[in-house]
UniProtKB/Swiss-Prot annotation:
Keyword Flavoprotein annotated: no
Pfam families cross-referenced by the UniProt entry: ASL_C2 (PF14698), Lyase_1 (PF00206)
InterPro entries in UniProt: Arg_succ_lyase_C, Argininosuccinate_lyase, Fumarase/histidase_N, Fumarate_lyase_fam, Fumarate_lyase_N, L-Aspartase-like
Gene: argH
Lineage, highest ranks first: Archaea, Methanobacteriati, Methanobacteriota, Stenosarchaea group, Methanomicrobia
Protein's name according to its UniProt entry: Argininosuccinate lyase
Compartments, record wording: Cytoplasm
Source organism (scientific name): Methanococcoides burtonii (strain DSM 6242 / NBRC 107633 / OCM 468 / ACE-M)
Length: 491
């Protein structure tokens, strides 16, 4: 191996342990395709600015296209990073007098920052698509369960009757915010550092705006020092992923709980379950458990990124090499988790009978009974709260006579004397009527849920339109880049 970097300044060759310690080749596989694009755009710009000759540009571009077709497997993995390995392969193909000109006016510092942003950009767009698919699945399942009664929980204790639609749209709303955070994060990722060189830009007459356009970036990171040293876009992305995974972990936790015999609200499709090596009857929700655990991985990746970037002096430091594996792991885990969650929800069986049967367990209708007392009997809510609280010590199905007896002890008179009837009590204890009365914006009534789901679908349509525009902008830019490549080669 002839190292095109070390042969000048450095006299000795590192041993295998040092090479393995300092190499980023494994993580750099993630940015291989982006590195080719960056090289193509930079080379075209060099030719346009007359920094390299047209014939050298042609040979370099042809070599890069060959390397692209050969794939990363053909590169020498003993080099310390993908950039030097790729450039060395190019020089082997076209000679140093030609291939050695490609890196004019450029550093690995701005090169790697550009590659990471390009690759992350693509994955963010894919994540947006996957989040939209998940939100659609949640909305569809909610629409099918507008009248599916279930207990609502606080502190994991039965609280009030609600519906499965109400419960799932809460998760859908959270996923919607995750989608919007991802879209907002994209704006700061899709900026070009290319042309910043090591940190002080270059004396070559580069056109940074030209490479920015060729690669489909929305703009430049203008300060060259900031361009090569900033990794806050990785921290922001990892924060978005961690927040998303926390939201998914909540759903995963409920899937695990709801799959138990004690709840038996749902049953996962067999594809998302496993069995025991000793207990043949077991059907374990392993996929949901793993997703729940993987949320911790993304939190760990975020913490690692924060620690790596902490207190680094300007401008570039090699510490930043350790950031790439962490964002890769976080991103891959998050995207896989979104797809898995979508599949679990789309294919799970819902036990509506069990859900409805437990909708009133634990006196979940107590709040509506207290509200009825306030509306009918004109007593303060705190007084009604006390009366119903005493009744909660009983069966959870109080009669008018039992209510009057407690009321006598609390306020010195019966509530029936204030207009409360047995029919009103029964209606207050009816979980279906409980839900139907809660028709305020965001409440669990079927009418309210229909409005919320329709509003959610309108937002998804808007998000989809924005996403399609982002994808089109990227695709058009890359298509134009390859058109420019063909023009340079065909001259």
């Amino acid at each position: 191996m002839s190292d095109i970097l070390r042969r000048g300044r450095l006299a000795s060759v590192p041993d295998e342990e040092i090479i393995n310690f300092t190499s980023s080749m494994n993580a750099d596989k993630w940015i291989f395709k982006a590195d080719i694009l960056v090289d193509l755009a930079h080379t075209i710009m060099l030719k346009e600015r007359k920094i390299i000759k047209a014939e050298d540009c042609k040979k370099i571009l042809e070599g890069l296209l060959t390397i692209k077709e050969e794939g990363i497997e053909k590169l020498d993995h003993t080099y310390e990073d993908i950039h030097i390995s790729l450039e060395s392969r190019l020089i082997d193909m076209v000679g140093e007098d030609t291939g050695g000109r490609m890196h004019s006016g450029r550093s690995r510092n701005d090169e790697v920052a550009t590659c990471i942003r390009l690759t992350l950009r693509n994955d963010l767009l894919l994540l947006m698509e996957e989040l939209i698919a998940l939100r659609n699945t949640l909305n569809d399942t909610s629409s099918e369960n507008l009248n599916t009664l279930m207990p609502g929980f606080t502190h994991l204790q039965h609280a009030q009757p609600t519906t499965l639609a109400h419960h799932l749209t809460a998760h859908a709303n959270a996923i919607g915010r995750d989608l919007e955070r991802t879209m907002d994060c994209y704006k700061r990722v899709n900026l070009s550092p290319l042309g910043a060189a090591a940190f002080a830009s270059t004396g070559f007459d580069l056109d940074r705006e030209r490479t920015c356009k060729l690669l489909g970036f929305d703009g430049l990171i203008e300060n060259s020092m900031d361009a090569v040293s900033s990794r806050d876009f990785l921290i922001e992305s990892a924060s978005v992923f961690a927040n998303l995974m926390i939201n998914l972990s909540k759903v995963a936790e409920e899937i695990v709980i709801w799959s138990t015999s004690e709840f038996a609200f749902i049953e996962l499709d067999d594809r998302y379950a496993s069995t025991s090596s000793i207990m043949p009857q077991k059907k374990n929700p392993d996929t949901a458990e793993l997703l729940r655990g993987k949320s911790g991985v993304t939190i760990g990746s975020l913490m690692s990124l924060l620690a790596i970037c902490k207190a680094l002096p300007l401008s570039y430091n090699r510490d930043l090499q350790e950031a790439t594996p962490n964002i890769m792991q976080s991103l891959e885990t998050t995207r896989a988790s979104v797809r898995i969650m979508n599949g679990m929800i789309a294919t799970m069986s819902i036990n509506k009978e069990n859900m409805a049967g437990l909708a009133t367990a634990g006196f979940t209708t107590a709040t509506e009974l207290a509200d009825t007392m306030v509306r009918v009997c004109d007593i303060p809510f705190r007084t009604a709260h006390q009366i119903v609280g005493v009744l909660a010590r009983g069966s959870g199905e109080p009669t008018l006579g039992e209510i009057d007896a407690v009321a006598h002890n609390v306020i010195g008179e019966s509530l029936s004397s204030r207009g409360l009837t047995e029919k009103m009590v029964k209606e207050a204890l009816d979980p279906i009527l409980n839900v139907s009365k809660r028709s305020v914006i965001g409440g669990p009534s079927p009418e309210s849920m229909e409005r919320l789901i329709e509003s959610s679908r309108e937002r998804i349509a808007n998000n989809t339109e924005i996403l399609e525009s982002l994808i089109a902008n990227r695709d058009n830019a890359i298509e134009s880049l390859f058109c420019e490549v063909e023009k340079c080669i065909d001259v």
